[in-house]
A protein has these predicted regions:
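Non-catalytic terminal accessory/regulatory regions of metabolic enzymes
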Residues: 1-90
Length: 90
């Protein structure tokens, strides 16, 4: 089946990236940084860990659909107290 379509209509593909806010301590990122240094990757100066979601939605990536993705990300995919998010068409 061609990219961007499914039997019965168009499919929009959206990538949502969720990251801890900069002021939130990231122990997992720090552990990865220590491992990088231990393994000889001394040029790695910092690591922040996050989540990536790939959504397939019925329809086209118009203003209405992107607004719904923002609602979904803010209510389900991210914890707005400690995380921020960004999304884009894939």
């Amino acid at each position: 089946m061609p990219r961007g379509s499914r039997k019965g209509g168009t499919v929009a593909r959206i990538v949502v990236e969720v990251m801890l806010k900069p002021e939130i301590h990231d122990p997992q990122g720090e552990a990865i940084l220590r491992a990088c240094q231990r393994l000889g990757f001394g040029d790695v100066l910092g690591v922040r860990q996050g989540k990536r979601f790939e959504l397939e939605l019925a329809g086209t990536a118009d203003e209405r659909l992107l607004a719904r993705v923002g609602e979904l990300a803010g209510e389900l995919l991210a914890n707005p107290v400690i995380e921020g998010f960004a999304f884009r068409e894939a």
